[in-house]
Structures are given as structure tokens and as C-alpha cells.
Amino acid sequence: MSKRPDWIKVKAPNSSEYYNTKDLIKNLKLNTVCEEAACPNIGECWSKKHATVMILGSVCTRACRFCNVKTGRPDLLDPHEPQRLAEAVQKLGLKHVVITSVDRDDLEDGGATHFAECISEIRKSSPNTTIEILTPDFLRKDGAAEIIANAKPDVFNHNVETVPSLYNTIRPGARYYNSLSLLHNIKKLSPEVFTKSGMMVGLGEEISEVVQVMDDLREAKVDFLTIGQYLQPTKNHAEVAKYVTPEEFKYLERVARTKGFLMVSASPLTRSSYHADEDFEKLKENYRHRHCEERRSIDVAIS
């Protein structure tokens, strides 16, 4: 694919806040998906002291064609990671934290218990901080959804990543309907937890396929949808088939809103945790507004 269009380009990070965040993460020996996945928004986010911490090590057991995270034999599980994560949240003064992880197919529960321990430690030291987790699919990990649901994150995010027709080439280790099932099960087990999912475009999908994914996610009771442009991390990854224009993203956002999502974020640089703190506040407000509208409708019907 030709060079990136102007609407994709971002400024190189150079603020003192960016380097302060970088130093803190390094000193606490934490991994971030911002660095590992070569996120284009790292400069903006770290300058605001926002970082998405990646737990369960830095090596993934899968090799998705879109992802820049290292693959191979995973690290040993670090029992002290939840405490270090909680310390970082406290030192950064985060009001909202996003926690993600590599896939850990080697673990009996896929790392679900470790996620729960991280949530618990943050609740102890920063009880007013809201917690969003972005998890792997826990494929063939019985009981993992229950562990996560019982931990009660404020937001549960699991990305379907792409349309089902591209799974064999882009996300070969995953199963589309397993991802939908996980999202549905979390909402069923903990209805009060907001659910969220995201996908990339520009991999060769058809618009009709993207719309079908929207319908599938709403069927799974997903509250929040994110859609962003796929960017090729290295020449060894899947090539960009198309750079979707900002106007096309606006169209996708309009269509998604008609499906009934509480929140939709769709733009070239949208990523799962981009502006997550601000979006969470909007998500809560949209929920309150919809709930009030539903109550009014019920009252009118009764009267």
C-alpha cells in the first residue's frame, strides 16, 4: 500500500510529561501495549499520564497478523505484578485505568485470575479509580468468564478485531463466535458491567461485513463500539488494503449509532483505550440518559 495519508500522521512525543510517564513505567517494570503494539497515539496519551498496562508478560502465545507484540514461549507469571500495577495507578493519579494482556493459552484459566487480582489490588489502593480491562478471548478456558465477571471491572472490553471472513488470515488462533459468546456471557453474568468491543478496518473487508459485525455485537448486548484504521506495524505483518477516509469513518459511526450502541468511536486513529477515561464518562452519561428516556416511556404507557 502507498504511504500513509496526512490524516494518519501524528507528532513525535517530546513533552516532559511523556518522559515522566515513560520513566515511571520503566522503574516499576511494567509492560504497556502502547509500546509493544507501536500505538500511534502514545505521545498524546503518555503526555496526559494515560497508559494501557499490559499484564501477564510481554510474550504472546499467538501470532495474529496485525499485532506487533512478541510471540513465542511466554514469560513466567509474576505474582507481584498486581501490586506494582496498583502502585503505578496511585502514583500516576489515574481516575480511569485500562489493563490489557497478551494471550496466555498456556495457563489453565488463560490469565483470568491474574486479571481479577490486578482489579482487587487497584481497588484497595485507589478505590475511586474506575477500571477497564481489555482481555484475550479465553478460548477453551472454562470458568474464565465467571472469574472476570465476579471481579466486577467497570468496563469489560474484548475486541473482535476484524470481520469473520478474515479470521483465518488475520486472527488464525481465534474464533469469531467465541469472542461474541464471551462478550454476551460477561453481560449476562454481570449486567451492570459496561461491555465494549473494537475492530480495525482497512484489511480488505466489505462495508456490509462491518455492518454485520455491528449487528452481531448488539445481539451480544455490547454497549460500546470502537472502529479504527489498521496500520501495518512491520513489513512482516498483514498489508494495509485500504486507508479508510475520515468521511467513511463518519458514515460507519452514523450507521453504528442507529444500531443502538450507547457509545461509538470511529476515526482513523481510534484505538480501544484511546481517550478511554473521557469516553467512560460519556458512556455513563449516555446510559443515564437512555434509562431516563425508557422510564418516561414506561410512565407514559402506564398513564
From Swiss-Prot:
Pathway(s) where this gene product acts: Protein modification; protein lipoylation via endogenous pathway; protein N(6)-(lipoyl)lysine from octanoyl-[acyl-carrier-protein]: step 2/2
Positions with a binding annotation for [4Fe-4S] cluster 2: C60, C64, C67
Keyword Secreted on entry: no
Keywords annotated in UniProt: 4Fe-4S, Cytoplasm, Iron, Iron-sulfur, Metal-binding, S-adenosyl-L-methionine, Transferase
Cofactor binding remark: Binds 2 [4Fe-4S] clusters per subunit. One cluster is coordinated with 3 cysteines and an exchangeable S-adenosyl-L-methionine.
All copies of domain Radical SAM core, residue ranges: 46-262
A GO MF label: metal ion binding
GO CC aspect terms: cytoplasm
CDD domains on file: Radical_SAM (cd01335)
EC number, UniProt record: 2.8.1.8
Cofactor(s) the record lists: [4Fe-4S] cluster
Location of the protein in the cell: Cytoplasm
Class of the enzyme per the UniProt entry, highest EC level: transferase
Family per similarity comment: Belongs to the radical SAM superfamily. Lipoyl synthase family.
Protein name: Lipoyl synthase
Organism: Rickettsia bellii (strain OSU 85-389)
